[in-house]
């Protein structure tokens, strides 16, 4: 079984500094599990590691796509699997840093993705269903299809329900049955960092302020000037869509800052909810008084007892 150290947690919790230290301490390289750090030129708004940090330790799945390119969980899973195999073969420890909950879970639990492409027409209909009835409406729709195929659907996440409905509509019940997972795909701990909500939210608010100080507005201006479509997938990330609204005169500067802070806090809350559904995560609680050395020591104790 291939080795993998996984570090998860909500945005701004402190994963970057930890993964850098672990990579140096364990002869490791970092694999990003973030859906937006894959894009070139999207640096400030994605909280991408700095140039110095990227130079200090090899990083993967960062700066690999142009802003107008599409990316998906299945592509991530395929690329991450290949990297983990290569690094293990070279006696290097891969360290997954996440990030995007679906991406991380799909890799660890080896979700089965087949060749059935997303159904645009169906997704528009599902968007309308979701807008009117929420996740409960999607679950009822999915369960009705599942009963016809003699299977059971327990998903509560919007995106997984969308995909399950697509597969069942196409008659592919077999793939969903295969997604029942026994154990994880890799040897190694899955460690989660968590903070008190007030502490995390303070860090998020300050991080957003720093993004503006570093030039987030200019970054978005330059991307638009270079011809990037404001409706592209990359601009769906928090920080970019709001600045576009500001540049279009739809909201004020202060409202833009407030909106990004609010949306990031909501995103962090969703991340926490997602990860709490993954029972194999070993959680470490930290606060503003916990030093980086203390965090590193606690994590190393878990890692050393896992290998």
Residue ranges and their predicted role:
Residues 1-307:
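Phosphate/pyrophosphate-binding catalytic cores of soluble transferases and nucleic-acid-acting enzymes
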